[in-house]
């Protein structure tokens, strides 16, 4: 809000200013998407508040917030570039803002609008599905043409304990996060059918004939290998636990 209220005071190229405004609007809309998605009615603040104003805000309806998000993104999309030069990698593009907008429509079950939005991304001609699924989450996958939005990181610079929180105890971590079984069940069989429909699914061998991305997404007890070590769940855990 502070940026948008003051950027017009800066002497700079008008076209560059339009792009920067679009970036900030996209980021603000993205934040409001998650607020409304998680909490429903939330205060919609679009200006810099005084202390008194901040202490007296009230929640706006989710419908109002979602309408704001959609309008902001649609305005931003018009001014964002399709691609960026290498030195600007990580800054939001037209495809990134369209991706956020499509996600909003999916969350709101506005299926046709979501479909039309994702079709616009496809028509940009700059994105493609990357077959290197595992690499998308490590340094090797940086600059993949599958990415719509990226959050850049500095290699080997640890400013918090997230690595320990996520890793299993076998590798010195705390294993605080585990996926739900519902996520595992969402991976279809190799015939493209859900597990409750596919004749290939065997509940006695639930990881066979499954979408290969499954075992690249979750660690399975006595199945997955990481850094040359077999993953074995903690003896006190549920025997079907995932990581």
Segment roles from a protein language model:
Residues 8, 36-44, 49, 84-85, ...:
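Short coil/turn linking the two alpha-helices of tandem helical-hairpin repeats
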Residues 52-54, 233-242:
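Short, solvent-exposed loop/beta-turn-alpha elements that line the ligand-binding surface or hinge
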Residues 69, 214, 240-242:
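Intrinsically disordered, low-complexity repeat and linker tracts
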Residues 1-39, 54-67, 73-87, 203, ...:
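Conserved, well-structured interaction surfaces
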Residues 8, 50, 61, 93, ...:
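Short, solvent-exposed coil/turn linker segments
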Residues 28, 33-35, 46-48, 133, ...:
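Glycine-rich, histidine-containing beta strand-loop boundary motifs that form or position
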Residues 42, 74-80, 91-238:
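An aromatic- and glycine-enriched ligand-binding surface/loop that stacks and positions planar moieties
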């Amino acid at each position: 809000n502070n940026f948008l209220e003051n950027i017009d005071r800066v002497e700079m190229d008008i076209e560059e200013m339009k792009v920067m405004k679009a970036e900030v609007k996209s980021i603000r809309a993205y934040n409001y998407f998650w607020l409304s998605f998680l909490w429903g009615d939330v205060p919609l603040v679009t200006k810099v508040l005084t202390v008194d104003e901040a202490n007296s805000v009230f929640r706006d309806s989710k419908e109002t917030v979602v309408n704001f998000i959609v309008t902001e993104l649609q305005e931003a999309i018009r001014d964002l570039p399709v691609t960026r030069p290498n030195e600007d990698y990580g800054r939001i593009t037209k495809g990134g803002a369209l991706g956020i907008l499509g996600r909003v429509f999916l969350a709101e079950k506005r299926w046709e609008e979501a479909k039309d939005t994702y079709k616009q991304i496809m028509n940009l001609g700059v994105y493609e599905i990357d077959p290197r699924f595992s690499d998308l989450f490590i340094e090797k996958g940086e600059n993949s043409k599958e990415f719509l939005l990226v959050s850049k990181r500095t290699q080997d610079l640890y400013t918090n304990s997230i690595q320990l929180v996520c890793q299993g105890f076998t590798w010195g971590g705390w294993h605080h996060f585990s996926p739900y079984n519902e996520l595992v069940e969402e991976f279809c069989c190799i015939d493209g059918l859900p597990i409750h429909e596919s004749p290939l699914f065997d509940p006695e061998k639930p990881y066979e004939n499954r979408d290969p991305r499954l075992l690249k997404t979750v660690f399975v007890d006595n199945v997955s290998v990481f850094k040359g070590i077999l993953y074995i769940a903690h003896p006190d855990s549920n025997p079907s636990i995932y990581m």
